[in-house]
């Protein structure tokens, strides 16, 4: 896991450094401020619990934006780890997802059924919702 704490209030969790930076840029573009850079790419993409514990250690975080895009890394595996950790930790933060790529259908179904959250089709829509929720 690669983590850098920042001064904002929108928590960010994405797979891959480029996607994480793009997500941070989008948060800024839509008037928010990122609370962190947290990238779970490479062999860390199954470490959902560790990632959530890191995000939740920052009391400034008011919403969590998850952006998964998988080619080699399977989005269903990433979602499984994150959903399981979410159920164990029972946070009260609002969470917003975009999920695209390998295993997408299963990942979306998992997030819908177990978290009761509807993933966004477009990253911009998820970002706008996360920024609004953090206000």
Which residues does each PLM region occupy?
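ATP-dependent carboxylate/acyl-activation modules
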Residues: 1-66, 76-80, 84-88, 100-135
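Short glycine-centered, acidic/aromatic-flanked micro-motifs in structured strand/loop junctions
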Residues: 68-70
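A short helix->loop->beta-strand "cap" motif at the edges of active sites that frequently abuts
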Residues: 91-95
């Amino acid at each position: 896991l690669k983590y850098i704490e920042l001064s904002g209030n929108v928590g960010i969790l994405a797979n891959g450094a480029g996607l994480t930076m793009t997500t941070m840029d989008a948060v800024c573009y839509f008037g928010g401020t990122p609370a962190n850079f947290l990238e779970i790419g490479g062999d860390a993409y199954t470490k959902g619990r560790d990632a959530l514990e890191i995000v939740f250690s920052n009391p400034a975080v008011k919403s969590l934006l998850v952006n998964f895009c998988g080619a080699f890394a399977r989005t269903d595996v990433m979602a499984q780890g994150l959903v399981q950790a979410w159920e164990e930790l029972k946070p009260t933060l609002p969470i917003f997802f975009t999920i695209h790529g390998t295993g997408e259908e299963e990942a979306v179904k998992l997030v819908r059924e177990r978290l009761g959250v509807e993933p966004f089709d477009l990253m911009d829509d998820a970002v706008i919702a996360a920024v609004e929720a953090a206000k």
